[in-house]
Structure formats: C-alpha cells, structure tokens
C-alpha cells in the first residue's frame, strides 16, 4: 500500500527569541503560517521492517539525519510497529532555507504513517510525537496559522491572514540555524512586536500585518550575508507591501495583494536568485 502526502513550507510572519534555555535552545514567540510550496512524499509499506529513505536531492541525506526518516523511526519504536516503510521524497522546498522543509517532511511522514499503519492518532498526538523530532514539526503537523512559544512546539491556533501573494527568494547560500541562534545577542538585537502581529492577523488587516513583520534573527544573518539585505531592498523598491527574512534565513519573502506586482518581483529577482517562487498563503487547511 502507498500513501501520498504533501509537505507545505512555512514562513514566520514574526519571530522573537525571548531567552536562552538550559537545554541550549531558545524560547521563541512567533507567528507562523503555511504557503502552497510543498514537497511530495510517497510512503510505501515494507514487510521487511526497515525504514528506507529515497530523497531525490544531492543535499538531502537518506539516513537518520533526515527528519522524515527520524519521524518514521520514532513512530515505529513508540508503537512497536513490525512493518517498515520506504519514503520517496520529491523536493520542491529549498534546502537549508528557513522554510522548515525538513520539519514539514517529518510532519507529512507522521500524518502519512498514521494512515498507512492504521494508528488512528489525533493531530495533537502526532504533534506531540513530532516535538521529539524537531521544534517546527508540531506546527507543520497542524498547518494553518499559529502562535508558537517554548522551543516552537507549544501552539495556539490563529485565524489565517487574508489571502495574498507571497514571493520567496533564496540566495545561493545555506545558513545554519544553530549558528544563527548561537550568535544571537538578545541585549542588542532589535525585537519585533509579536502582539501587534497577532492583533493584525486577528483583525485581518493586511496593511498592519505588513507593518508588523519582524524577525530578531535578521540581526545576525543580515550582517553575515549582505545578499539577504540586498534582496530585501530590491523587493521593497519593486513595491512589495511587506518584506522579511523567514526563520534563520537566507530566504526572504515579500507579501503583496497584487498578482501583477508579484510577477514583477519574480521577474526582477530571477536576475540574481536562481530559486524564486510565487505562491499563496494556504489558509486553514492543507
């Protein structure tokens, strides 16, 4: 039996880190939402009991370093599943981009295996298991839009922002999330107003959403990688209503209500970014 699942990317509309935790992670306070750029996974049951990963991408590992593999291993051990699974992964989300591609693959694996192995777990139960795999996995299990706290695993559902176009641009660099958080100085970094973003989303106020975009990690990534700042400036000059780096970067996104403006951004960015996407916010369900 084979199950096909989609793994959509996420963006952070606002991201603040509030304190460093004893476990080395940071406490975060953020609003995340899903977009319709997605990886595709095919999960096929194996009688042998092994987990076999088949990622069609040079920079994506096929072993326990892959979060989808790790998710399958955690679920298999937790419920003492005898059968195995082959995970065929077709990547569309850029790698090491701040878009939670790996976390979303893990979440999609959990959702798919719940069906394949007939576990009948709720999304909440899958999200709890996902927190063992990675901080962004619980959000990716639930999808939609949410306020995240703790390491990112504590979620409060939020109405999704009004529909708009999202232009994603990833420069040809990779950024290590651990390195960015490690270099973060909470004393000097400019901190975003998370409450203002939550209010803007609840009020469905697109202008206020664009004005409230903020990411404390820009204070680290932008000085390290000037090309990220250049992309932000270019997007603003092309008339994007809101511009922000997603996660630890290096991907930058622009929000606009106008399709022709999104297309203009895409055409301009293709000149100096080989990974550019025009997508939509996914809304409540995926």
From Swiss-Prot:
Reactions listed under catalytic activity: 4-CDP-2-C-methyl-D-erythritol + ATP = 4-CDP-2-C-methyl-D-erythritol 2-phosphate + ADP + H(+)
Pathway assigned to this chain's UniProt record: Isoprenoid biosynthesis; isopentenyl diphosphate biosynthesis via DXP pathway; isopentenyl diphosphate from 1-deoxy-D-xylulose 5-phosphate: step 3/6
Active site (UniProt): 10, 136
Keywords, in A-Z order: ATP-binding, Isoprene biosynthesis, Kinase, Nucleotide-binding, Transferase
GO molecular function: 4-(cytidine 5'-diphospho)-2-C-methyl-D-erythritol kinase activity; ATP binding
Keyword Endoplasmic reticulum annotated: no
EC number: 2.7.1.148
NCBIfam families: ispE (TIGR00154), PRK14608.1 (NF011202)
Family: Belongs to the GHMP kinase family. IspE subfamily.
Record's function text: Catalyzes the phosphorylation of the position 2 hydroxy group of 4-diphosphocytidyl-2C-methyl-D-erythritol.
Protein name per Swiss-Prot or TrEMBL: 4-diphosphocytidyl-2-C-methyl-D-erythritol kinase
Species of origin: Exiguobacterium sibiricum (strain DSM 17290 / CCUG 55495 / CIP 109462 / JCM 13490 / 255-15)
